[in-house]
Amino acid sequence: MDKNGAAQKLIAIFGHMDFIGLLHSILVETSKYIIIILFAIYTWHCFSVFVGNNTEKKDKVYRRQNKIMYTIHFICTAVLFLNSLDVTILGLYLAQLALLIFVNKAYIYVYENASKMVLNNMLMLLMIGFVMIGRLNREHLIRQMIFAAAICLIGLFIPLLIEHFSYFDRFGLVYAVIGILMLALVFVIGKTIYGAKNWIVIGGFAMQPSEFVKIIYVFFVAAWLSKSTQWKDVIKVAVLAGVHVLILVAEKDLGAALIYYITFLSILYVASRNIGYLGLGLFGGSAAAVVAYHLFTHVQTRVTAWRDPWGTINDAGYQVAQSLFAIGTGGWFGMGLGEGMPNKIPVAETDFIFSAISEELGAFFAICLILVEISCFIMFVNIALKIKRRFYKLTSLGLAMEYVFQVFLTIGGVTKFIPSTGVTLPLVSYGGSSVISTIILFCIIQGMYVLNCKEEESLETQQETDASKRRVRKR
């Protein structure tokens, strides 16, 4: 049966089209408030688990978060389905639901000590991305689901690899060479998309090497600085890190260049605890930004759009102006899923997906989304602070900074807080390279959390054994 035939059959079942339209209107209007309330409760739980050590109580919170996620997913799908009566939406929903349930159950089954908060947030952000990308572009949704499913399956083994392979800190120079070669590859076979020559197209799929290299890059900096922070070693790692950044600047991928630079400074400061390095780095970065503004016309264009999007609305400022229109139109509660016009925003499903979310789901939902992203960062930092191995500690902190700074650049750009840098919102925006690298990031953090839990359990067992031996000797 074709789509039209299925729609006609559904209409016949419910009586007539007016009833469907009325049902849809009621559902859209009520659902946006229900979704906001549910997401607010989920967000509250993201922070409530940081207080107290009651494991049983926290497990109840995690299970409640899962129920909230599945409920929001169902409501959003119901609204989108009634909007078009396209049965394909139901098929995609079932596939998404199967993926979310499988990943949730599989990770907990394989890793008993897995951080349920990290897992829950990863799945919640993925789900929001599925809903919004499906609302904007069905073909892109299918691709996103394929990429997410594949990397979630592969990512299941990443914590296992981290647990059983303890030599990651020995290959600092190797990581640097691999990263530089991968970034430089675009000069040979790269393509220019959206003004930046940082894409490689293979079999119809476009990917950004910088998204994958940013993981290797953190391993490189952490491996080097975990061994020494003497001046000569800092100079060496700074030069190699600078090569990464300069290649990205040459490719006109300034958003990624900023992320790499800030990540390097963060790891350097934490490793050395030298405020002088941080001050010198920030001064050098500011000077480089001024130079980039005068050298690159596309940087000048973005700064102009940031300073006065309304005055350049027919040219450079069109994208930012449409983004602000969408956010303003949505207000606090949103237009309702499917009721806005996010397609008027250029690249709404990638760089500007936060604007589309704000328009249809409202500012309250968008603020909760920001808070969930922040809770991810806090959780990453908490995990890093508990880790005793210096390399893993620096790696976790570096990945945390990469994640939160990318969120800042994305949301700051679409809200006119800073000039747009062309980076995506992790796990939410469409993009195979982005979703793959971010899930890998979450899995690495998960692996380090699991490893640390096992080491703590082993230490406690050893301490209990030693205490028992001492008691026996006293007798």
Whereabouts are the PLM-identified features?
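Extended repeat-based interaction scaffolds and adjacent low-complexity, acidic/S/T/P-biased segments
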Residues: G52-D59
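Membrane-helix interface and helix-disruption motif detector
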Residues: M17-S31, F81-L92, L136-R143
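Short, strongly hydrophobic alpha-helical membrane anchors
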Residues: M1-H24
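Hydrophobic alpha-helical transmembrane segments of multi-pass inner membrane proteins, especially
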Residues: F74, D86-D315, S355-T415, I440, ...
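Transmembrane alpha-helices of multi-pass inner-membrane enzymes
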Residues: K416-T461
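N-terminal signal-anchor/start-transfer transmembrane helix
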Residues: K32-V51
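N-terminal secretory targeting signals
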Residues: L22-I34, Y109, S458-R475
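TM-adjacent membrane-interface loops and short helices in multi-pass inner/ER membrane proteins
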Residues: P309-T350, F354, A363-F365
